[in-house]
């Protein structure tokens, strides 16, 4: 049930002419017993209606109630005419007589009305029109209108009868509009416009309200039409209504109480009940046809036409209903929609303003979105056009991004990858080839976009006319201590090996040597097992490999590794059997061992050149150089010096005062000072170049090594370098490569396998040695890192926190302190004040210049992480023979040593009936009265046990000691 607020009730009362302020209305409602607090309080509809009726009954003027009528009754206006003199009413039985009523004076009207000749005929014409009426009549079931009107008998005029008081006012019927003061029908000429009164009511004189239904009007020569025929004899006649105050009232005529109707505001129809008929009143049905409109009579302002209002649902939903009061539909417009130009021209300014207000009130508001129903036609799947089924990606793309681009579920893509044998997650990066495979499976085409390195580093076609002969690049490889560097010293006529730590080479050395056969570039690689990556890089950039094998040692593991690296690079191998001057040298045994690796000497019918040489006596060195020159001629080594330079990084390091220094080998073009180059994720401009002798050079032709200064960082050994147009282009290429590397690292996800978990469980609870590695050159740092990682065992692992080149800095110390690790420096030293900072942070710094010494020391540190094994070592036994009680010491067990030795402060166990009753330590050990350190077998002594006095004869005391045994890494 809906509610109504107090201020809305006040507005409704105001429409009925009752002016009440909000405070007065609240006090009135409280007086009537309603629980309200302010003008915003709410009342139920039935409560509001009851309060409205009560207040209206108290404040409205008393008037005779109009005859109740059904819904749809319309009270029309009546024309004002001259009232004829009213006849005096005849006295009625059992009722008081009425006073004689004087005739009304002629009243001004809107139109001149002709006098009526035959009042009886006019009365018949002035009958009310047929209007819908409820099924049940308030008069006690009077039949519906449509019966023929019957003339009523004329009542005799009353003689000086007192006026009858007006009946109490009844509530107005909401379906009836208040009419203007009407005139008797007998005073209107035929055809004059007359507004009919309520059904069954004859109008009275001008200025008099119509009587209640069934009231008999008076007038000269006018008989009321009474349903049911003439009145029966003896039936009392209805009294005449008193004339109201106002124009046309006769002097001395009694008037009904109440205010002047002209001062009232338009309200619902009100009437004064004079009397009710004793017989049912039938409604008169006028003849069908067009009605004649009559001018309205003077009097109170009449209400406008009756409008039929429509109940519409609210635009905001919430199951509310509102009354549509819009007038736009009468003008052919829809509320809330734009007005056409023609309609706007036809309206006045005031109407346009009203229309604008109405349109503003009808702004359409979107309601709740309806859920799609399952009914209807089947959804049609549309296919994309071919030009829209193209996906553009860069080097890599994640599975989720690819699924969004294709409009395919990520689970479907992962399923396809699993079917192809690739495990991937939704956020994992996949390369362009894998993305192209998935795109093809779902009908899409993949195109690469973004940065193209070829735009900055284009491939240049080889111009045969500009090619010149370049020197060969020869890499010397072999096992450690087989004389590789000594052989190069003999060729260069230098003594490099004597200056190397431990007499071994630990990074690549590049040298350009002038020989009688021409210039040759030699690369000296380390032979230690830790420098595998260096040997592989040397094999990739070389034209010829000289494999050095000691005649007294034979083929060793690194010899085999060098053979495999050279074959993998597709490089020609030339074997130099060194140290033939030493006693016990057997070159034939070496040649026999090499045949197992498909290296057969020419002397034995093979294709491999094998020469016996001696670095000490320089035996066989000229023949070696001749064979190198012969092989270079066979290979036809040529290059174009006019191209932009390109090549490979042989070694890189970070020197104090010089910055990043890279040793590069120029393979194509000519490298000049000032060139902008890029290598890996680093770039820069060549600031200076130096050869192997430390001399600065301005340009380097192809086939020669050189040290380059001016890079933004330390490059990775083995990376290619290229010269580009300017430094800006070099920076863009380097940044693109760095971004690509970052995405690759993020996409690579390493998951722990069961083997990793078992290995961690077997490693003593996951003991790990954290290490920070710093070296002089990038290759050495890489070699040390790999060597330390290989030193890890099942019990203790090795984790490299960081690795780099250059001096040990404060940042390295803080990194090691955060990871509770150590710092390993190889061929480098810490900066000033770094040792004191490391001591404060509790970080150990280990410095080495020989790699195998570094590995041995790291293994010791790893073993120190393992907890020692506690082992029990038996000492001896003693049997308790007697007990002695000594003050402050308690019971002393007089015992005889039966086995081994009993030492003071040794751990003991007391056994009684072969069961341990106590374990502790010896507190005192005496021989007679002297304290002794130990007692041997066969002697008696007194033994005092700490915290135990319940010793009994026959107990056995076992003495033992605990010793710690350091665990082994194996």
From Swiss-Prot:
Residues 503-507 are annotated as: G2. The keyword Metal-binding does not apply. Residues 54-270, 328-348 are annotated as: Disordered. Keywords: Cytoplasm, GTP-binding, Initiation factor, Nucleotide-binding, Protein biosynthesis. GTP binds at residues 478-485, 524-528, 578-581. Residues 150-160, 168-182 have a biased composition (Pro residues). SUPFAM superfamilies: Initiation factor IF2/eIF5b, domain 3 (SSF52156), P-loop containing nucleoside triphosphate hydrolases (SSF52540), Translation proteins (SSF50447). Residues 524-527 are annotated as: G3. Residues 87-96, 121-149, 183-253 have a biased composition (Low complexity). Residues 578-581 are annotated as: G4. The keyword Metal-binding does not apply. GO terms for cellular component: cytosol. It is found in: Cytoplasm. One of the essential components for the initiation of protein synthesis. Protects formylmethionyl-tRNA from spontaneous hydrolysis and promotes its binding to the 30S ribosomal subunits. Also involved in the hydrolysis of GTP during the formation of the 70S ribosomal complex. This is Translation initiation factor IF-2. It comes from Anaeromyxobacter sp. (strain Fw109-5). The lineage of its organism: Bacteria, Pseudomonadati, Myxococcota, Myxococcia, Myxococcales. The gene is infB.
């Amino acid at each position: 049930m809906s509610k109504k607020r107090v201020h809305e009730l006040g507005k409704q009362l105001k429409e009925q002419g009752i002016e009440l302020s909000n405070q007065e209305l609240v006090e009135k409602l409280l007086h009537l017993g309603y629980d309200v607090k302010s003008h915003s309080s709410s009342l139920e509809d039935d409560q509001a209606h009851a309060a409205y009726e009560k207040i209206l009954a108290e404040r409205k003027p008393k008037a005779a109630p109009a005859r109740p009528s059904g819904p749809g009754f319309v009270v029309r206006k009546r024309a004002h005419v001259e009232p004829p003199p009213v006849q005096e009413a005849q006295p009625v039985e059992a009722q008081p007589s009425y006073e004689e009523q004087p005739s009304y004076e002629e009243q001004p009207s809107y139109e001149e009305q002709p006098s009526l000749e035959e009042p009886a005929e006019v009365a018949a014409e002035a009958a009310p029109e047929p209007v819908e009426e409820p099924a049940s009549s308030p008069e006690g079931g009077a039949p519906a209108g449509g019966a023929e009107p019957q003339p009523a008998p004329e009542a005799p005029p009353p003689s000086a009868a007192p006026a009858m008081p007006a009946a109490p006012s009844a509530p107005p019927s909401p379906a009836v509009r208040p009419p203007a003061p009407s005139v008797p029908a007998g005073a209107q000429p035929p055809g004059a416009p007359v507004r009919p009164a309520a059904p069954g009511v004859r109008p009275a004189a001008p200025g008099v309200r119509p009587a209640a239904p069934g009231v008999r009007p008076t007038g000269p020569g006018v008989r009321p039409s009474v349903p049911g025929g003439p009145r029966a004899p003896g039936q009392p006649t209805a009294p005449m209504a008193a004339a109201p105050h106002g124009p046309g009232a006769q002097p001395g005529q009694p008037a009904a109480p109440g205010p002047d109707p002209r001062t009232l505001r338009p309200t619902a129809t009100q009437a004064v009940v004079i009397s009710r008929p004793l017989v049912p009143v039938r409604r008169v049905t006028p003849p069908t046809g067009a009605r004649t409109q009559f001018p309205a009579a003077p009097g109170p302002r009449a209400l406008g036409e009756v409008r039929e209002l429509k109940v519409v649902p609210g635009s905001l939903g919430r199951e509310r209903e509102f009354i549509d009061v819009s007038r736009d539909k009468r003008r052919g417009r829809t509320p809330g929609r734009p007005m056409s130009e023609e309609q706007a021209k036809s309206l006045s300014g005031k109407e346009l303003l009203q229309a604008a207000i109405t349109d503003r009130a009808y702004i359409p508001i979107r309601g709740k979105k309806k859920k799609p129903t399952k009914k209807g036609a089947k959804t049609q799947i549309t296919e994309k056009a071919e030009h829209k089924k193209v996906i553009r990606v860069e080097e890599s793309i994640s599975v989720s991004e690819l699924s969004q681009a294709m409009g395919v579920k990520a689970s479907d893509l992962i399923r396809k990858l699993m079917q192809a044998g690739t495990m991937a997650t939704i956020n994992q990066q996949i390369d362009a080839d894998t993305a192209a495979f998935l795109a093809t499976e779902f009908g899409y085409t993949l195109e690469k976009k973004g940065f193209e390195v070829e735009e900055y580093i284009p491939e240049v076609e080889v111009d045969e006319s500009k090619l010149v002969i370049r020197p060969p690049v020869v890499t010397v490889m072999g096992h450690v201590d087989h004389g590789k560097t000594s052989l190069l010293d003999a060729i260069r006529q230098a003594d490099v090996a004597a200056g190397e730590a431990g007499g071994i080479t630990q990074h690549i050395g590049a040298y350009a040597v002038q020989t009688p056969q021409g210039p040759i570039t030699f690369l000296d690689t380390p032979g230690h097992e830790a420098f595998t990556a260096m040997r592989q890089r040397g094999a990739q950039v070389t034209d010829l490999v000289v494999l050095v094998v000691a005649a007294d040692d034979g083929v060793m593991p690194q010899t085999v590794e060098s053979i495999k690296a050279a074959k993998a690079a597709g490089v020609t191998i030339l074997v130099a059997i060194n140290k033939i001057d030493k006693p016990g040298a057997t070159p034939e045994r070496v040649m026999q061992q090499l045949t197992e690796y498909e290296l057969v000497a020419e002397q034995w019918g093979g294709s491999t050149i094998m020469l016996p040489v001696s670095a000490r006596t320089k035996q066989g060195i000229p023949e070696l150089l001749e064979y190198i020159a012969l092989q270079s001629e066979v290979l036809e080594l040529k290059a174009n010096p006019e191209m932009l330079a390109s090549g490979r990084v042989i070694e890189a390091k970070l020197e104090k005062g010089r910055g990043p220094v890279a040793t590069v080998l120029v393979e194509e073009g000519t490298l000049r000072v000032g060139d902008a180059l890029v290598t890996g994720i680093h770039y820069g401009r060549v600031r200076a170049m130096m050869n192997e002798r430390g001399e600065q050079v301005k340009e380097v032709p192809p086939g020669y090594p050189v040290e380059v200064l001016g890079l933004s960082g330390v490059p990775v050994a083995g990376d290619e370098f290229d010269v580009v147009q300017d430094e800006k282009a070099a920076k863009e290429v380097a940044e693109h490569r760095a971004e690509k590397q970052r995405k690759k690292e993020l996409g690579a996800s390493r998951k722990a396998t069961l083997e990793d978990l078992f290995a961690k469980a077997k490693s003593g609870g996951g003991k790990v040695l954290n290490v920070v590695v710093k070296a002089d050159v990038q290759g050495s740092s890489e070699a040390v890192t790999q060597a330390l990682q290989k030193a890890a065992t099942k019990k203790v692992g090795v984790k490299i926190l960081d690795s780099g080149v250059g001096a040990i800095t404060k940042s390295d110390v803080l990194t090691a302190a955060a990871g509770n690790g150590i710092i390993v420096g190889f061929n480098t030293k810490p900066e000033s004040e770094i040792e004191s900072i490391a001591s404060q942070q509790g970080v150990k710094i280990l410095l080495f210049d020989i790699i195998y010494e570094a590995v041995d020391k790291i293994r010791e540190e790893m073993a120190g992480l393992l907890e020692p094994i506690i082992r029990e070592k038996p000492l001896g036994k003693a049997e308790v023979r007697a007990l002695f009680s000594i003050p402050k010491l308690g019971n002393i067990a007089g015992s005889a040593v039966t086995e081994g030795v009993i030492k003071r402060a040794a751990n003991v166990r007391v056994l009684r009936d072969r069961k341990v009753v106590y374990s502790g330590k010896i507190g005192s050990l005496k021989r007679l009265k002297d304290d002794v350190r130990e007692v041997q077998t066969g002697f008696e002594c007194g033994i005092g046990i700490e915290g135990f006095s319940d010793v009994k004869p026959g107990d056995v005391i076992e003495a033992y000691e605990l010793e710690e045994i350091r665990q082994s890494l194996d």
